[in-house]
């Protein structure tokens, strides 16, 4: 298990005021999404298909040898997302 993030929170009205929240990822999730390799693990692939090439959350491009940030395109052939208004997704409720 890998620690992905750590968050501290304070609740003023409680006797035990402070809390710590850990965001954890398993080794298999870290490999699948980011491409971090772990030695002596028999089967790292868990979330993506076995024929899948690459790692979806990895920002480093091996061809240009640097981190590449690209805008996310949410359009699909059968659907166009309009993120300006949450009510545009429900035309029957206008």
From Swiss-Prot:
A single GO cellular-component term on record = mitochondrial inner membrane
The topology of this chain with respect to the membrane is: Peripheral membrane protein
Primary subcellular site in the record, as a coarse category: mitochondrion
Establish whether keyword Ubl conjugation is in the entry: no
InterPro entries tied to this protein: NADH_quin_OxRdtase_su_C/D-like, NADH_UbQ_OxRdtase_30kDa_su
User: EC no.?
Assistant: 7.1.1.2
What top-level class of enzyme does the UniProt entry assign? translocase
**Does the record's keyword annotation contain tRNA processing?**
no
Q: Where does this one sit in the cell?
A: Mitochondrion inner membrane
The record's keywords, sorted A to Z, are: Electron transport, Membrane, Mitochondrion, Mitochondrion inner membrane, NAD, Oxidoreductase, Respiratory chain, Translocase, Transport, Ubiquinone
What reaction(s) does this enzyme catalyze?
a ubiquinone + NADH + 5 H(+)(in) = a ubiquinol + NAD(+) + 4 H(+)(out)
- Functional description taken from the UniProt entry: Core subunit of the mitochondrial membrane respiratory chain NADH dehydrogenase (Complex I) which catalyzes electron transfer from NADH through the respiratory chain, using ubiquinone as an electron acceptor. Essential for the catalytic activity and assembly of complex I.
State whether it acts alone or in a complex, and with which partners, per the record. Answer: Core subunit of respiratory chain NADH dehydrogenase (Complex I) which is composed of 45 different subunits. Interacts with NDUFAF3. Interacts with RAB5IF. Found in subcomplexes containing subunits NDUFS2, MT-ND1 and NDUFA13.
Protein name (Swiss-Prot/TrEMBL): NADH dehydrogenase [ubiquinone] iron-sulfur protein 3, mitochondrial
Source species of the chain: Mesocricetus auratus
